């Protein structure tokens, strides 16, 4: 008979790997909070900035336009510099961009900030690598499920909390700016907390990095066609 499997120690924060899991899903949560902070505030932003319907629709495209290529780029950076530094820098950078979006005075400024904020969607790949470094094979599935599931909840919290912050807490014409700017400040502060409390691997383990980046070799026309199709989303 097989020994009974121990329950996943989700709240055993005295264990280093569990602490890292909570720090990591919260980082992912904050990236989604930033990424979707503007969605429920678009009616207020539209009125305040005198935007047209076409301009509002443009934000929907700009919000995700950079995400796919950014995930590839961030993945390369994670391999080279490690998830701890990569996540900390991404949080700080996107926090600054979020404040820039909140302070924008023209549609063009809003559009540029919104486009660049698509970087936040790349945070997902960082946490996947970090969690896999900290958890054994028998636990990595549930750990990554918690990371992804709880982190994604940031989008729902953004939808609920942003109008409350903008209207009830801050109020006035610039309430939406203060609400969105606050999420940027939170991200910047958390980037420091994350960097100071997380390591790439458990104590004594080695973080393996690629020895050298090289081009992907293809040897047949069929492989070349497959490679082109695989990369089409980057340019669409």
Where are the language model's segments positioned?
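Cytoplasmic helix-loop-helix junction between adjacent transmembrane helices
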Residues: 113-151
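Short hydrophobic/alpha-helical segments at membrane-entry points of transmembrane helices
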Residues: 106-114, 227
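MFS-fold secondary transporters
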Residues: 97-101, 117, 194
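Conserved MFS/SLC helix-loop-helix module at the cytosolic interface between two early adjacent transmembrane helices
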Residues: 69-107
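Helix-loop-helix hairpin linking two adjacent transmembrane segments in secondary transporters
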Residues: 147-200
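Extracytoplasmic
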Residues: 19-53
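Residue-level signature of mid-helix packing/kink "hotspots" within the transmembrane helices
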Residues: 36, 63-72, 122, 156
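Flexible cytoplasmic inter-helical loops of multi-pass small-molecule transporters
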Residues: 2, 195-222
